[in-house]
Amino acid sequence: MKKRMFSLIIVLSMLIVGIPMIAHAETSGKCGDNLTWTLDDNGTITISGTGDMINYEYYNLSPFYNDNSINSVIIEDGVSSIGACAFVGCSNLSSIKIPKTLTFVGGNAFNDCANLKKLYITDMAEYLNIDFGNSVTHILSGSNNKLYLNDKRVTSIEIPNTVTRIPKFAFCGVDSITDVIIPDSVTSIGDSAFRNCSSLRYVDIPDSVNVIGHYAFCDCESLEEIELPKNITYIGNLLFYDCRNLSKIVLPESIVDIYNYAFSGCWKLTNIKI
């Protein structure tokens, strides 16, 4: 009797102070009309089938919500979207592999996934064609991220000439990238596209690019010089913020506006050409 009473007191104490009680999670289920998921003993979620994932909300929680047993996610060929709020709070999620069939990532899909640092892709052009939801969203975030193309870590990037735009957050925080060559087919670079690429030293931007988003090269601390394309009309918020080794920049005559803190922290910037 005393033993049972003691156990009850422990349970009640946990509830009062807010200590979470761990329950056994399901290991398989559906996450779309034609999609299923499985969780193995190593903490890997595999999503397979065809079509779109369900879009979740905070009142319609994903089966993966706040699941700290998930270490990696593999999304197989045939899956076309990652649902909104799909992996919110998966604090131990460290890597994700996405297929070339993926075309959309829903808003807040990876919110509070602070350890998500490795992204595996199989096709660069298809990766850069992914659309993101209306909410501020990304796959990788922060710094010290790793991008792998066919299991090889990406360092130098030559964007395929079938690509027409580089989406927001595309290479955010990928610290291994040293140089990027962008083809004439590209017309825009999205917000934070190369933000926190700490090893990025060289970017070749063609004159076909007429829009460069806010924060696009923010915190690229190894970038030393850059020439902006002749058709852009503004320099966005914090575009080169804290590019501490940037010493030379060539600006086009088309510039009519420079937004807040565009060159703040560029302590070595002494050569500006127009």
Regions found by a protein language model. Name each.
Residues 9-18:
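Bacterial N-terminal signal peptides
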Residues 18-27:
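Sec-dependent signal peptide cleavage junction
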Residues 42-51, 68-81, 91-104, 114-130, ...:
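Structural signature of tandem-repeat unit edges
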Residues 83-86, 106-109, 167-170, 190-195, ...:
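Consensus positions within tandem repeat domains that build extended binding/scaffold surfaces
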